[in-house]
Amino acid sequence: MEDITICIATPDEIPELVGSITKARAEMFPFLDQASSNRMAQKEHENFRKNHLDHPLGAFLTARSEGRLVATIGYVPYDGRFPFLNLEPDNVVEVVRLYVNPEWRRAGIASKLFAQLADKAQHAGVKQLYLHTHPFLPNAIGFWEQNGFSIMSVDKDPVWQTTHMSRLLKE
């Protein structure tokens, strides 16, 4: 594999990143209808800079090979939308948008991206990382467990079985 460069996303990359996120969402969740996908993409585009680039508890990293986007990961301030979770009261972020292009998988890129993201979060004063994933996403739960996350709760919904996970960061 060619050399990979991991960088903090910039405002001029937003259209490309939102396009990539939209494509990844269609691959991971093929059962979502096009209208829902379009609404999510529009919302993502409108809020990307505010949530990922301008917010002190936001970040977004890209991995590129020879200028080509091959993977992404980010975090945003946790919005409290799952009140049943027992998360820290302050400085909690939600890890989002980990995606590695299929031809680049199993090369350690996701682990490298996450390690840099966790380091950035720690330097930003983040106390806890939260994420949710689903068992139908190949290797997702195992990957996060290998990276220090613990399962907090699993929704009983038979389709999504949303798996809520968290990891405390060292002070």
Describe the function of each predicted region.
Residues 1-15, 171:
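Conserved N-terminal entry element of GNAT/NAT acetyltransferase domains
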Residues 46-62, 94:
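A short helix-loop-beta-strand connector motif used in the catalytic cores of GNAT acetyltransferases and
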Residues 90, 96-105:
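A short, internal acetyl-CoA/4′-phosphopantetheine-binding micro-motif in the GNAT/acyltransferase core
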Residues 5, 25-49:
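Conserved GNAT-fold acetyl-CoA-binding loop/helix
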Residues 62, 68-77, 94, 99:
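Conserved beta-strand in the GNAT
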Residues 100, 106-119, 145-146:
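Conserved acetyl-CoA-binding loop-helix of GNAT-fold acetyltransferases
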